[in-house]
Amino acid sequence: MTHSPLAQFDIKKLIDIKMFGFDVSFTNSSIYMLLASILALTYFYLAFYNRKLVPSRLQVSAEIVYNLVADMLNQNIGVKGRKFIPLVFSLFIFILFCNLLGMTPYSFTTTSHIIVTFTLAILVFLMVTIVGFVKHGLRFLTLFLPHGTPLWLAPLMIVIELFTYLARPVSLSLRLAANMMAGHVLLKVIAGFTVSLMIYLKFLPIPIMVILIGFEIFVAILQAYIFTILSCMYLNDAINLH
C-alpha cells in the first residue's frame, strides 16, 4: 500500500500527546497547518514591513490579495462588510497557503481532510449565525421564510430553508476536501505512469505533467476563492436578510 495514491493522505503521529483522555497528538497535518500559518505571516510581514510609495513586487502582490478579499466583501455585503475583512482575509489566506503548500513534493495537503475543512466550515457557520442573531435578534429567523411565501406553503418552505441552512457547512467542507483530494490522486496516478510512458513517448509525458500541475495549482487557488466567496454570501444573508 506504500505506492497507493491514497497513501499521501495518511495522518501520522509525530509527537504522541494525551490530554484529559483525548488524543491531541502533534501530527504531520498539524505541522503543515502550522507551517502554512508561519509562511503566510512571514510573507505579509516582509511585504508590508517597509512599505514604500513605489511598492515592491512583493508589496504589490500582497495588496492584490488583500484587495481581492476586500472587494469580495464589498460586492456581496457592502460597507457593512468592512468590519469582517480581518476574519475573512485570514480564512482565505490560511486555506490558500494550505492548498499551495500541499503542491510541494513530499508534503501533506491538510485541506484534503474533511475534519479540517469541516472545522473551518463550522467556524463560518457559527459566525454567520451569531452575527445574524446579534444584528436582528429573533427576526433573523425570517431568513427561513422567503418573502411572499403563501401561508399554506410556509411550513414546507421553513423545513426546506432550515435544511439548506444546516447543510451549508457540509457542502462547504466537502467541496474543498473532495476537490483537493481528487486532484492530488489524479496527479499521483498519472505521475506513476509517466516513467513507463517515457519509454514509448520519449519526453512527451513531462510537459503533460507540467500542465496538470499548473492546472492543480489553479484549482488550489480557485477552491480557496470559492470557499471565501461563499462565506461572504452567507454573511450577506445574515446581515442584510435577503
From Swiss-Prot:
Top-level taxonomic group: Bacteria
UniProt cross-references to InterPro entries, sorted A to Z: ATP_synth_F0_asu, ATP_synth_F0_asu_AS, ATP_synth_F0_asu_bact/mt, F0_ATP_A_sf
GO molecular function per UniProt: proton-transporting ATP synthase activity, rotational mechanism
CDD domains from the UniProt entry: ATP-synt_Fo_a_6
Coiled-coil residue spans: none
Statement: the UniProt record of this protein carries the keyword Transport: yes
Transmembrane segments: 29-49, 84-104, 114-134, 140-160, 181-201, 203-223
Entry membrane topology: Multi-pass membrane protein
Keywords associated with the record: ATP synthesis, Cell inner membrane, Cell membrane, CF(0), Hydrogen ion transport, Ion transport, Membrane, Transmembrane, Transmembrane helix, Transport
Name of one Pfam family that matches: ATP-synt_A
GO CC annotations, alphabetized: plasma membrane; proton-transporting ATP synthase complex
Subcellular location as annotated: Cell inner membrane
HAMAP family hit by this protein: ATP_synth_a_bact
Annotated function: Key component of the proton channel; it plays a direct role in the translocation of protons across the membrane.
PANTHER family: ATP SYNTHASE SUBUNIT A (PTHR11410:SF0)
Self-association state and partner proteins as the record states: F-type ATPases have 2 components, CF(1) - the catalytic core - and CF(0) - the membrane proton channel. CF(1) has five subunits: alpha(3), beta(3), gamma(1), delta(1), epsilon(1). CF(0) has three main subunits: a(1), b(2) and c(9-12). The alpha and beta chains form an alternating ring which encloses part of the gamma chain. CF(1) is attached to CF(0) by a central stalk formed by the gamma and epsilon chains, while a peripheral stalk is formed by the delta and b chains.
Family, per entry: Belongs to the ATPase A chain family.
Protein's UniProt name: ATP synthase subunit a
Organism whose genome encodes this protein: Rickettsia conorii (strain ATCC VR-613 / Malish 7)
Lineage: Bacteria, Pseudomonadati, Pseudomonadota, Alphaproteobacteria, Rickettsiales
Annotated gene: atpB
